[in-house]
Amino acid sequence: MEKGMVAMNEWIEKSKTYLWLPFTQMKDYEQHPLVIESGEGIFLTDVNGKTYYDGYSSLWLNVHGHRKKEIDDAIRAQLERIAHSTLLGAANIPAIALAEKLIEWTPSHLTRVFYSDSGAEAVEIALKIAFQYWRNIGENKKQKFVTLANGYHGDTVGAISVGAIDIFHTVYEPLMFTSYKAPFPLVYRHPSNDPNVVRDEALGALEALFAEHHEEIAAMIVEGMIQGAGGMHVMPKGYLKGVEQLCRQYNILFIVDEVATGFGRTGKRFAIEHEDVQPDIMTVAKGITGGYLPIAATLTTEAIYEAFYGDYTEFKTFFHGHSYTGNQLGCAAALANIQIFERERLIEQIQQKATFVAEQLASFNELNHVGDVRQLGLMCGIELVRDRRTHEPYPWTERMGYRTTLTMREKGMLTRPLGDVIVFMPPLASTFEQLEAMIAMMKEAIIETTEKRG
C-alpha cells in the first residue's frame, strides 16, 4: 500500500478513535466515516482525494465559498497586529468597527451589539438580557418565555429550554426551565391547506396565551420567517408581523433569532426585512464571518441598553461574557465578509438565484415520495414521504432522509437531513451552473433511494 493511502486511512481511524462528533451517532460514523482535508470555492475534498459539493454550506454558514481571498487576507493582516485580547473591560478596533457596521446593516432601532462565540450563546444572551431588563426596571413578575412548537434556538441549556424538538430536547427536560409553547403556523398537513387560515389560527392561539399570561411573560423568541432545524417550515405571509404586533400590545419583548437566516440566506440581509419587523433583540451568527470563524452577536435597542446603565452599586451590570468574545480575527473576517456583500451586490444575486432554484425544484413535486418542497431564498427543505397523496411519513426507523444523503455523498454532494427532510442550503456564491448540478444530483439521489431501496 502506498504511503499516501496509509496516511489517509490513519486519519480515518484516528477520527474513530479520538473524536466524538456533534449531533452524530458514532456507530453510524464508524460505518460511513468522512474526514475533510481541504476546500476550494463551494467544494470540499476528503483525505481520499474525493471532492464534494458543499450542499449545506458547512452547516448553513458558508457564504462566498472556501478560501475566499479577501477574507483570507483580512485574517492574515489582523494576525500581523494581534490575534486576541479580552473584551472584558477593554475594547478592540475590529470589534468596534464590526459593531458599527452591524448597526448600519440592521434596522435603525437596534443600536447596541453584544458579542459571543456561537448562535446558541447569542440566544442565551438574548434570554438573559430580556430577563434582567424587566428586573432592572422593577417588573420582577415577568420571568417566563414563549417559543413556538418545533422551534430550535441552539443546544445550550437556556436555548433548549426555549426549543421544542422532542428528539433533541426531551432527554434534558429535568435540566430545562419551563417555557410556554405556542403553535407554529404549519401549513403542510393542515386540513385547510390555506396559509391565511393557518396563520390566523396560530395568531389567535398566541393572543389567547398572551391575554392569560402576559403579566409573567418577559419575551417571546422566534426564528426569522422560517423554522430551520424544525424542518424548513416557512411562516405564512403576515405571521411574523402579527407576532410583533401582539408583543407590542401585551408589553412583551420580541426576540428574533436570525442565526441561520441572517446575512442574505433568505434573499434579504435579514429575514425580518420580509415583513418590516423590528425586534427588541436580535441574534446573528453563522453567516456573519462568511463561514470562517466563530463570531456571534446579540443586538438590542438603546432603551434596553439604558436599563443596564448606571452606577455599579445599582447592580444593573450585565454579568455575561466568554473568553474569546469579540475576537479580533473573527471580527476582521466578518468585516471582510460584509464588504464583499456590498461590493458584489450579493443580495440582488441571491434573489435571482432563489428564483432559479425554485424553478429547478418545481419538478421535485412530481416525484412519488416527495411530499412537500419548502423554500425561502436559498434555504430549502424537501420532505420525503411514503405516500405523497396522503402525506403519510416514512417510519422514522427507516431513516429515509439519512439514507438519501448517503446516496448524495456517493454522487459527490454533502448535506445533512432533518429527519426525512433533505436540506439544501448551498453557499450563497454558488453559480447558476453549480446550483443546477447540485439540484440534479439531489433529485437523482432521492429517486434512487426512495424508488429502489424504499
UniProtKB/Swiss-Prot annotation:
UniProt: substrate binding residues: Y152, K286, G321, R416
Cofactor: pyridoxal 5'-phosphate
Pathway given in the UniProt record: Cofactor biosynthesis; biotin biosynthesis; 7,8-diaminononanoate from 8-amino-7-oxononanoate (SAM route): step 1/1
Chemical reaction(s) catalysed: (8S)-8-amino-7-oxononanoate + S-adenosyl-L-methionine = S-adenosyl-4-methylsulfanyl-2-oxobutanoate + (7R,8S)-7,8-diammoniononanoate
UniProt-listed GO biological process terms: biotin biosynthetic process
InterPro entries for the chain: Aminotrans_3, Aminotrans_3_PPA_site, BioA, PyrdxlP-dep_Trfase, PyrdxlP-dep_Trfase_major, PyrdxlP-dep_Trfase_small
Cellular component annotations (GO), alphabetically ordered: cytoplasm
EC number assigned by the record: 2.6.1.62
Family matches, as Pfam families: Aminotran_3
Main localization (coarse): cytoplasm
Compartment(s) where it occurs, according to its Swiss-Prot or TrEMBL record: Cytoplasm
SUBUNIT field: Homodimer.
Described purpose of this protein according to its UniProt entry: Catalyzes the transfer of the alpha-amino group from S-adenosyl-L-methionine (SAM) to 7-keto-8-aminopelargonic acid (KAPA) to form 7,8-diaminopelargonic acid (DAPA). It is the only aminotransferase known to utilize SAM as an amino donor.
Family of the protein in this entry: Belongs to the class-III pyridoxal-phosphate-dependent aminotransferase family. BioA subfamily.
Record-given protein name: Adenosylmethionine-8-amino-7-oxononanoate aminotransferase
Species for this entry: Anoxybacillus flavithermus (strain DSM 21510 / WK1)
